[in-house]
Amino acid sequence: MLTTLKNAFKIKELRGKILFTFAMMVVIRIGSQLPVPGMNGEYFRSWFAEQSNGAFSLFDAITGGSFLNMSILALNINPYITSSIIMQLLTIAIPKLEEMQRDGEDGRKKIASITRYVTVVLALIQATAMAVGFGRQGLLSEYNALNIICSIATLTAGSAFLMWIGERITEKGIGNGISIVLVINIISRMPEDLGNLFQQFVFGKPPATAVLAVVIIFAVIIGMVVLVIILNDGVRRIPVQYANKVQGRKMVGGQTSNIPLKVNTAGVIPVIFAQSLISLPVYISAFAGYSGTGVWSEVLKYLDSRYWCNPGQLKYSIGLLGYIAMIIFFAYFYTSITFNPLMIADNMKKQGGFIPGIRPGKPTSEYLNKVLNYIVFIGAVGLTFVAVLPYLFSGVFNASVSFAGTSLIIIVSVVLETMKQVESQMLVRNYKGFLEK
């Protein structure tokens, strides 16, 4: 791997892309430390320590600590992620957007432009909720119209700026820019999380216990990475045979192909959807400054991941069961709108293709649907395990980490995709790359 990086730096074009990406990473980390003018950072850190919950802890991890610092990048690229998911769903639901998607490069540019506008609108809404909601509780040094407007403008501009950086990385750097931004944010929190784990389970312990703890910690991390790689790269290939045809004096066809069905077709989207729905009431209550009393207080605890796996309060595990059910549901839902067995079977029939042992047409679509449901179930269970494990770890050992669950899925997926992109560029120049190691 190091040899590959060394060889990559020998190529001027590739070296420029890598250096540009690293430069943008530095800009992002600097921006995450710049506070929003007029905001009381000490108050917010105190509030976060006393009242924060699992939803806000995850939000802070994804923003690389920008949220806790209440920096100009506090909203980060969350509005863009939400906007992209919304546009993906609308593209399938609205025929006009679907036509744009099929119009090639011009259509995709139009959809990208709409996504940017939706991102700014969502950022504006979230910034307003934060400035007004938290501002009334003491976040703003002076709660007046000028500070509110300044905070809203700064937070919205920060989110738009990160979106712009992500697009520039995609255009001039290595990998998908938005994904790179997300990974940098998550990775920036890992040293602190590892430090907390070592502080709790290693430092001050007897040598034998400390060594065992280190081995277990890294074994769990490596095991989860391997599982995520399997989920990300696992593929079931359905063989397809094409019948022979006579065109003029030539016999054509008779070729074989396959339909690749990924184990985790939906990626991390089911987890993001489930967490968004679970966290929405928690966010609204926090912005409104209402922690809840009586029944509502209990409802918030059922939705708070800190209580899900607490051995002393197992009744709140009902919230975890709801979370698991939503992940599985969204895995099937997202796959159903992105993969159409009936359309694929129809196209195969028109092209003279068939699955060996399966009749063309409806039997083929039924077979594909049956196999797809089986694969999606396996992927959903694996995805659920990876997403839920950190909550089990947190509940049993009272330790929270951001390098597990959703964060780990994102990191591994982006790193693998970026490695493949570098590998493809290296192979063009006859270099041995990552994937051969």
Which positions does each model-derived feature cover?
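N-terminal cationic and glycine-rich segments that engage phosphates or anionic surfaces
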Residues: 1-101, 105-437
